């Protein structure tokens, strides 16, 4: 996907306080800034997940040109041969700030961050809104393209889900493995989607018909 991005403009506004994003990826290049996905109104209002040039990751939300959320890992992600499953589970209504955003890598929650700015309680993030807001998968709006492969990119638009919705631990090897049948605890939500389920198909497999374009 080194020069490719997928794009969708939501037609509905759902909860901007509760959502879960899950995807599987294999990095094709390290030591470079690469955006995996962003939901973007403009440069000062967006939410994104990216790998940094030092191979940490950052999940952040920018509102009115100010950082409302920034989580940058201490851990480095330099394995270009294996797959990572990333699950980002958000519920800003939670009273405890560290429960408002939970990030799991291969089923294990990341708790060590070099930068940790959690969103204020009940904050509406820059996501899940109709109008001029656009989803970009594989880039930061035509820049900082992701170099690698992706599979099973899922968005659950109204609930904070556990990583076990998207993967499970192999009882023999102990490795985190993909669940090919994804069943959210409630539903995908109106803006929810599941793409790249079978090869490179951009057709939404969640029954919502939220299909992406290339």
Whereabouts are the PLM-identified features?
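Extended recognition patches within non-cytosolic domains
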Residues: 1-4, 95-97, 111-118, 149-214
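Short tryptophan-centered beta-strand motifs in secreted/extracellular beta-sheet-rich domains
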Residues: 23, 81-92, 103
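Short hydrophobic/aromatic patches on beta-strands that form ligand-binding or substrate-lining surfaces
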Residues: 21-29, 86-88, 137, 150-154, ...
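Extracellular glycan-interaction patches encoded by glycine-rich segments
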Residues: 125-150
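Extracellular glycan-recognition modules
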Residues: 3-60, 94-97, 161-164
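Beta-strand-rich, repetitive solenoid scaffolds
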Residues: 7-9, 38-40, 48-52, 58-62, ...
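Short surface loop/edge beta-strand patches of beta-sandwich-type extracellular domains
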Residues: 1-18, 68-78, 140-142, 178-186
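Acidic glycine-/aspartate-rich tracts in secreted/extracellular proteins
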Residues: 26-32, 42-43, 63-65, 91-95, ...
